[in-house]
A protein has these predicted regions:
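Feature recognizes metal-dependent phosphohydrolase scaffolds
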Residues: 1-635
């Protein structure tokens, strides 16, 4: 039904629209364009989480679009190509520059090879472009050869002999001009752009893998991307903004997992002063282990001060350094007396009233690290991007995306949290946490910077949702103290009523919406399902990082949303560029249909489509204003 326009005086919106569409013809053209787009199939969305710095696997998944390109190649070429030919063609699309160099070295990059593969790329791109309006295609094509690629895509050789001759001459001319390599590279880029319209990354680029910086560089080049911060992300964000507790934790984690390259090579942050200092303190330890011990004590000192000045964070039970009985080599906790694994604490005065006081050397090292983190250009560039494209949660196209949890009580109610005299629960708490993270970025005030550390590991943090027991795991031999109680949310994800309550809290349909989470690795090898509560919740942390492969039994998940529904891919094995070039190795995945649409979802069914509908209403009002003389169109 056509929207009912308002015939009265033109408002501000109409006057602004009239500047953009000054004639009736311009309004009509835009209306027709938008109305047509509404019935196109919705774009393909890919959801991934918990990449944890595993660049090689991510790079391959990005290039093969989680296996979608191979599926399209199978569909387009079927029995016309052998299995081996398809594998080699896919590798060419994934890594065109490297594959062309390999074929050239093997003297296989002949004119016939170029013509054949450019024609294959053309057929593949033509099929994949049908979801897009023709006017948008040029914007998806690399600029250097755009005019010829647009012409090739527009040819219809099956319809007319002249069109066939035209296409054949274009292909022959490309090879004659020695431009085959450039065209293959640009066609490969176009195919990847057509395969995925939007990427959603549900947190945690950082942690154990060695190249989160390289992952972020790749993601920054993607056209349509959003990020839902993970606890590891906000830790690094807080460190880049100058939080001493976040910095000490980042340094400790990097040392603990032998992952200092990302600091030193990726971000230009030197740990040499810390290592030199630590070697004097712990001469019998390996340099990295000594530095880890020094960073650990530094962390507990600055964490203790942070907790003391922020009682509303609810972390008082994590301030434990003063519980060490140095003479009896034990820790006296509320739960009992526990033996220490190590008894040597050279930077703590055992007779001091306050063990949290930094030594002069510790203060100098910490000040140097704060300077290095806050002045790293590459880290700042990445953190700017995380803030620009990121948020604590996102509501998009009927899905609720967030990394961790919405804090709940044991019976599934939204936990009420008091901060600075105000009470928050459910969505209001996540909104407040998002605001505090942005305040840290904008104003660098102490309270907001401290809040970033809380978001990393606080029991009531929606990004953590568990009591992180670093002190016990570091110092105590009794492993019963190591258990980290988690928020009831994680247990209640299997409960449909709870998931429906969460969806409703965020304005989504409790019967049709989906919660999409990361954070908690799904133990697929033990039979655990990532699909919870009858499909209302989907956990997509499948362990991209090699350190988690043994725990999950797979190499990660990709959730795919297209016009036909939701599909979850469990990646059993992920090739890398070397494997792909050596033997055309690829990704091996098991697909599970989470939800099958009864009718194809169109652009009009999406959030973008609803925004288009609003624009259409405004344009009809503008057209009526022109027709009724309320506004005068330009001649």
């Amino acid at each position: 039904m056509r929207p009912i326009p308002h015939p009265g005086r033109p408002g501000k919106i109409l006057r602004l629209l009239a500047e953009k569409y000054p004639t009736k013809e311009a309004v009509m053209s835009r209306l027709i364009y938008l109305q047509g787009q509404l019935v196109l199939p919705k774009g393909v969305e890919h959801f991934m989480s918990d990449l944890h710095g595993e660049y090689a696997a991510f790079y391959h998944i990005l290039n093969n679009c989680s296996g979608v390109i191979r599926e399209k190649v199978d569909y387009v070429f079927g029995a016309r190509m052998s299995k081996e030919e398809k594998a080699e063609f896919c590798t060419l699309i994934y890594y065109p520059k490297e594959k062309i160099e390999q074929m050239t070295a093997a003297r296989r990059a002949t004119p016939a090879w170029y013509r054949e593969n450019i024609a294959r790329c053309l057929a593949l791109a033509r099929l994949m472009s049908w979801k897009y309006p023709a006017s948008r295609l040029p914007g998806l094509i690399p600029a250097r050869l755009r005019p010829v690629l647009v012409e090739l895509l527009a040819t219809r050789p099956e319809a007319d002999a002249a069109q066939l001759a035209y296409q054949q001459r274009l292909l022959a001319s490309i090879v004659q001009a020695d431009a085959g390599a450039e065209f293959l590279e640009d066609f490969a880029a176009l195919v990847k752009r057509l395969a995925v319209a939007e990427f959603h990354f549900v947190g945690d680029f950082f942690d154990r893998g060695g190249r989160p910086d390289a992952i972020l560089d790749r993601i920054m080049a993607l056209p349509e991307v959003d990020i839902e911060w993970g606890n590891h992300d906000v830790l690094w964000m807080g460190a880049a903004l100058g939080s001493p507790a976040c910095i000490a934790t980042v340094v400790r984690n990097s040392l603990r997992y032998d992952n200092v390259d990302v600091l030193e090579r990726g971000y230009g942050i030197s740990l040499r002063p810390l290592v030199t200092f630590a070697q004097h303190l712990y001469p019998d330890e390996a340099p990295i282990r000594a530095a880890e011990r020094a960073a650990t004590i530094l962390l507990f000192k600055v964490e203790g001060a942070l907790i003391e000045r922020n009682p509303d964070l609810g972390m008082a039970n994590r301030r434990l350094l003063h519980c060490i009985d140095f003479r009896n080599v034990c820790a006296v906790l509320p739960s009992g007396r526990y033996e220490l694994r190590k008894a040597y604490f050279p930077t703590i005065d055992e007779d001091a009233v306050d063990p949290y006081v930094l030594t002069l050397e510790e203060r100098e090292i910490l000040d140097g690290l704060v300077t290095s983190f806050t002045e790293s250009p590459s880290l700042r560039r990445h953190v700017d991007f995380l803030y620009r494209k990121g948020s604590l949660y996102l509501v998009r196209n009927g899905n609720l995306l967030f990394h961790g949890c919405v804090p709940l009580t044991e019976d599934g109610a939204f936990r009420e949290i008091t901060y600075d005299g105000k009470k928050y629960a459910g969505r209001a708490w996540l909104d407040f946490c998002d605001q505090m993270a942005r305040a840290a970025y904008l104003y660098h005030e102490q309270e907001a910077l401290d809040f970033m550390y809380f978001l990393w590991c606080g029991r009531l943090s929606p990004l953590s949702g568990r009591e992180v027991r670093t002190f016990e795991r570091t110092f105590l031999a009794d492993k019963t103290t190591w258990e980290e109680p988690a928020d009831p949310y994680y247990r209640l994800l299997d409960d449909e009523e709870t998931c429906e309550r969460v969806l409703k809290e965020f304005g989504l349909s409790p019967k049709k919406g989906h919660i999409i989470n990361g954070h908690v690795p799904v133990k697929v090898k033990k039979g655990e399902s990532p699909v919870k509560a009858g499909g209302r919740a989907i956990i997509i942390d499948g362990g991209f990082c090699k350190a988690y492969h043994e725990k999950t039994g797979i190499s990660g998940f990709t959730l795919i949303s297209n016009s036909r529904g939701l599909r979850l891919l469990a990646h059993q094995k992920i090739a890398d560029v070397r494997t792909a070039l050596a033997d055309n190795g690829d990704i091996e995945s098991v697909a599970e249909t989470v939800e099958l649409a009864t009718i194809h979802t169109t652009v009009g069914d999406t959030d973008k489509g609803r925004a288009m509908q609003e624009e259409i209403t405004d344009l009809y009002n503008l057209l009526l204003a022109y027709q009724n003389g309320v506004l005068k169109p330009q001649a």
